[in-house]
Amino acid sequence: MEHKETGCQQPEGPILCINNCGFFGSAATMNMCSKCHKEMIMKQEQAKLAASSIDSIVNGGDSGKEPIIAGHAEVAVAQVEVKTLVAQPAEIAGPSEGVTVNPKGREGPNRCSTCRKRVGLTGFNCRCGNLYCAMHRYSDKHDCQFDYRTAARDAIAKANPVVKAEKLDKI
């Protein structure tokens, strides 16, 4: 009898979440489960942040002068058309040249240029432009025609330009 007098009543049964997620909700979380309630709060906070950032952008950085009202923010998004131009390799080379360009690159399996062994994905590309196995990957093992010394000299000269000061006049 004391329960009826104080006004505390137990619920008749467990209440399912209003989002139909399968969990039980409570009156403290607006008949939502804890997960759905947390997601709803996060969405409201993100909407507030979005509204304040849009307001600061529109007003030129005058944030904090006007109060932000919690609610739904309507945002207009402009559609941007992106046009890409794709040039075919034959168009770049020109129709007058008799060179055929293979868009795939190499035909068939990847093979070492020296021993013709199948290398698959473990092949090593050399600076001379060929593919080699683990045994022939070094330049001294496959008679590489690439001049590493000149390439390194040019790279160092490009990275470190000569700085020369003007001569000073004597007084």
UniProtKB/Swiss-Prot annotation:
What residues bind Zn(2+) 2, as annotated?
Answer: 112, 115, 133, 136
Q: List the disulfide bonds.
A: none
Q: Which annotated residues bind Zn(2+) 3?
A: 126, 128, 142, 144
Tell what triggers its expression.
Answer: By cold, dehydration and salt stress.
Query: Which parts of the sequence bind Zn(2+) 1?
Result: 17, 21, 33, 36
Q: Where are the zinc fingers (A20-type)?
A: 11-45
Name the InterPro entries for this protein: AN1-like_Znf (IPR035896), AN1_A20_ZnFinger (IPR050652), Znf_A20 (IPR002653), Znf_AN1 (IPR000058)
Keyword annotations from UniProtKB, A to Z: Metal-binding, Stress response, Zinc, Zinc-finger
Q: Which domain of life does this protein belong to?
A: Eukaryota
Gene Ontology MF terms: DNA binding; zinc ion binding
State the protein's purpose: May be involved in environmental stress response.
Protein name (database record): Zinc finger A20 and AN1 domain-containing stress-associated protein 8
Gene name, per UniProt, is SAP8
